[in-house]
């Protein structure tokens, strides 16, 4: 069975890659704490939306990761750590809102409910929000780095290719004549051919 997706970690972020075979990843929230090579991934997360999405995507694409240590200082207002705990415990509603999150903008837009469910099943979160002592963090990482079995399913690559809808519209009238062939809608700042009308 394949344990790690190709090109893992899938999404870029503020993290360091350690041992991809490790059972633990470390999220230091808004704190910058020196990384240990024994963790699969080690990095910060300051937002309750994109930050949480990146953690989920990079976790479920490596079946070796079974634990996530959440430590460091919480980001003010965004509450990324609280939101990570909430999505793991409660998931997301039909609008993509993290159920139970008190973060400022706790909406997940780029991953599916299936990806969230896989995250909930694959990992155990170790809530040590506020812990910044590197020695204590090292003890936890070393305790969990080899603990447990690989998740019994292949890695799940969960990146949506959401396409943004274009906001460009052709004006229905031009208020500035540029030439016989072109007019401009000064309110929209759009130049069009006269054939478009």
Swiss-Prot record:
GO terms for molecular function: methyltransferase activity. It is an enzyme of class 2 (transferase). Belongs to the MtrA family. Its EC number is 2.1.1.-. One of its GO terms (biological process) is methylation. May be part of a complex composed of 3 subunits; MtxA, MtxH and MtxX. This is Putative methyltransferase Mtx subunit A. The keyword Ribosomal protein does not apply. The lineage of its organism: Archaea, Methanobacteriati, Methanobacteriota, Stenosarchaea group, Methanomicrobia. Keywords: Methyltransferase, Transferase. It comes from the Archaea. InterPro entries: MeTrfase_MtrA/MtxA. Transmembrane segments: none annotated.
């Amino acid at each position: 069975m394949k344990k790690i997706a190709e090109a893992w970690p899938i999404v870029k972020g503020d993290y360091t890659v350690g041992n991809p075979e490790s059972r633990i990843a470390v999220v230091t929230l808004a704190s910058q704490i020196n990384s240990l090579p024994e963790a699969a991934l080690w990095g910060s997360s300051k937002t309750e939306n994109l930050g949480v999405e990146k953690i989920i995507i990079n976790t479920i694409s490596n079946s070796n990761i079974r634990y996530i240590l959440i430590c460091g200082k919480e980001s003010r207002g965004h509450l990324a750590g609280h939101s990570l705990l909430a999505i793991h415990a409660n998931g997301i509603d039909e609008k993509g809102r993290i159920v139970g999150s008190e973060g400022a903008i706790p909406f997940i837009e780029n991953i599916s409910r299936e990806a969230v469910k896989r995250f909930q099943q694959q990992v155990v979160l170790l809530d040590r929000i506020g812990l910044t002592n590197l020695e204590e963090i090292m003890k936890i990482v070393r305790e969990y780095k080899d603990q447990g079995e690989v998740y019994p399913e292949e890695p799940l690559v969960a990146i949506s290719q959401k396409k943004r809808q274009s906001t460009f519209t052709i004006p229905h009238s031009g208020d500035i004549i540029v030439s016989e062939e072109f007019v401009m809608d000064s309110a929209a700042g759009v130049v069009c051919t006269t054939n478009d009308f």
